[in-house]
Amino acid sequence: MAAVDLRAVSKTYDGRQFAVRAVSLSVPDGELAVFVGPSGCGKSTLLRMIAGLETISQGDIAIGDMRVNDLPARERDIAMVFQDYALYPHKSVMENMAFGLRLRRTPEAEIRRRVGDAADLLQIGPLLDRKPAALSGGQRQRVAIGRAIVRQPKVFLFDEPLSNLDAQLRTDMRAEIKRLHQRLGTTIIYVTHDQVEAMTLASRIAVLHAGQLQQYDTPARLYRQPGNLFVAGFMGSPPMNRLAATLTPQSVEWGGGAFCLRPAGWTAPWPEQVPLVLGVRPEHVMVGPAPADALTGQATVALVEPLGAETLVTLQVGRQTLVCRASSDMTVTTGDTLTFSVHPRHLHAFHPDSGAIW
Amino acid sequence: MPTGRRPAAPPVGVFWWFVAPFALLTLVFGVWPIVLAVQTSFTASATALQPNAKWVGWANYAVLWSDPIFANALQRTLLYTGLAVFSTIVAALLYALLLQSVWIGRGRLFFKVAVFLPVVTPDIAGYVVWRWLYDQSFGAINTALDALGLPLFGGIASTSTVLGAVMVAELWHHVGFYVVIFWANLALCDKGQSEAAQMDGANAWQHFWHVLLPQLRPALLVNSVYALIQYLKTFTVVAVMTKGGPNETTNFVSYYAYQLFDQGRYGEATAMATVLFALILLLSALAMHFQVRSRLP
C-alpha cells in the first residue's frame, strides 16, 4: 500500500503538443481516486505514465516514497485492469491469475491459496479451469480484477474497466469494485469518462480537460463548488445550467435583456455592464411558489421529459434555456407559461472567457 | 418496387467461370503429370515412355527398397530438412522480431529490403554467386579468412561443412518469405496482452515465451508446413552448387531421382518421386493435424 504523488507531470510526443500538461496531485494511501474527463483529455495517458507503460516527458511520479520515473513497469509493484481485459487467451483462468505470481517464483501452495481467495472473493471459483474464450464479458472482467488482486500490489490501476459491459452489469460491477476497495483498503486509481462512475466510486476526483487538471477534490465539493465552467458542465446529469448574463449595478440580466433577475438586496460593488456566466444546478431551479428571498422569473415550457422518479423540464427564458429537475407529480405541458425561482445561494458565477469561478 | 435492397447476388455458376482457366491449368500442368509419373513408376524403364508400357507392378519400388544409395539419400534428406526447417523458422522469427523492435529505428526499411530482395532474385543466380563465395582458391570468404590469418573454410568442398554451407545459401535465399509471414502475424498480436504481461512483471524473454509465441501459432503453422515441403524437395541448390557431392553428401532424394531419370531409369526415378510425394503429403498432414489441434482452446 502506498500513496501516489504526481508533481508537474507532462506528456508530449513532439515537444509542442501536450497530451498531459503539468498535472500535480497526490492520492493518499488507501484512497480511491478517479481521473475523469471526456475522450482525449489525457486521463488514460496519465494513468499509463503511472503504470510505466508511457514515458514521463516532464515532472516526477512517486509511489510511496520512491520516484519511479526511471523504473520499468514490472518493477513498480502496480497491477492494472485494462478496458479490454487483456487476458491471456491460451491460459486458463487459474493460470491467468497465477501468471504474475509464477514470474515472481511464489511457492505453488501460496499461489493456490491466493488465487483461491481471490476467486472466492470475486465468485469465479467454478471458472478456474476455463479459458477466457469460454467466459462472458462480466466474468472476464472479474478474472482481470482477480489477476490484479492476487499480486497484492501497492497500487491498483483501473483503465475504464466497465465500459465494455452492458448497463446493468456495469452498475453491479461498480458496486462490487467499491466493496472490494473497502475490503482491501489498497490505493486505487481509476480512469473513466463516466461522471456517474466517478461520483459513486471516488474518495477524490480529478477532472481533466485538454491535458490539464481542472479540479481535484472530493465528489461532494466538486459537485457543490465546481472550480470552473468545465467542471460545472461535466459533473452532474443533466449538467449545470450555464447562462450568459450581464451584471449591472441594479441587476443581473440574461436572455439578451428579455428577462431580468432582480436580486433583492443584492448591492452592486462592480462597475457597470460586466459580462459573466451564471450557473445553476437543475435541482435548484424551482417551479411553483417562490420563497421570499429567491430570484423569480417567467418562462415557457419547451420540453418535458418524465424519468419516473422525477421530471426534467426544459424552460425557454428569452433566447436561453434552463433545465429544471422537478417532482414527477408536477403536471406541466409543452407551451405552458410558468413562474420559476432560484435561490441566490445556488447561483455560481463564472468568467465568460476563462471559465474560472468568479 | 424493391427499395433499399442490395442487388441480387450473381448465380454461383459465374464464379466457376472465373476459376475455370486456372483450374484447367492446374489440372493439365499440375495434376496430370503427377498421375502420369505415378503411372510410370509401375512400368519397366525400358518401355516407360512408349505407348504400350510394360507393367511391372511394385518392381521399381522393390529396387528402391534394396538400393543403399536411396536409403542414404532419404536419410540425408530427412536430416537436412529437419535442420533446415528448424533454422529457417528460428532465423525468420528472430529477424521478424528485429524488424518489429524499436531500436532499429530508421534502419527498418533497409532491413526489410535486405531480407526480401533475395526472395525475388532468381534461384540459380543466387546459388552461382554463393558457389563463387565458397570457392576454395578465389572465393571471397576464404580470401577474407586468409587475409585475417584465420583457417580456411571448407565450404562446399568439404564433406563436413557442405550441408551447413548449402543450408546457409538456402536460408539466405528463402528466409525473407518466412519473415514476411511472421511479421504480418506479429503486427496482429494484441498489444494489450503485452502490456498486461509488463504489469505482471514479465521480462523480455518471459513476454516472448508466454505472450507472443502463443499468438504466433498461425504463422508457425504456415511457415513450418511450407518449409517442410520446400526443403524435402531441395533440388536447385544442389544442382547448381554441388551436384550431389562431395562424396554424395548432398545427394538428396529429388536430386538422386533426377540423376536416375537422366540415366533413363524412368521407372525407378518416378517411383522415387512418388515416395517423396507421399512423404511430403504425410508429414504436412501430420504437422497440420498436430498444430491445428494444439491451437484449440
Map each language-model feature to its residues.
Chain A
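The feature captures the beta-strand-to-loop junction immediately N-terminal to the Walker
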Residues: 36-38
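Helix-to-loop junction immediately C-terminal to a conserved catalytic motif
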Residues: 51
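Conserved coupling/switch loops of ABC nucleotide-binding domains, chiefly the family-specific signature
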Residues: 57-60, 210, 347
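Conserved ABC transporter NBD signature motif
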Residues: 59-67
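ABC ATPase nucleotide-binding domains
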Residues: 73-230
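ATPase nucleotide-binding modules
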Residues: 227-277, 283-302, 311, 315-332, ...
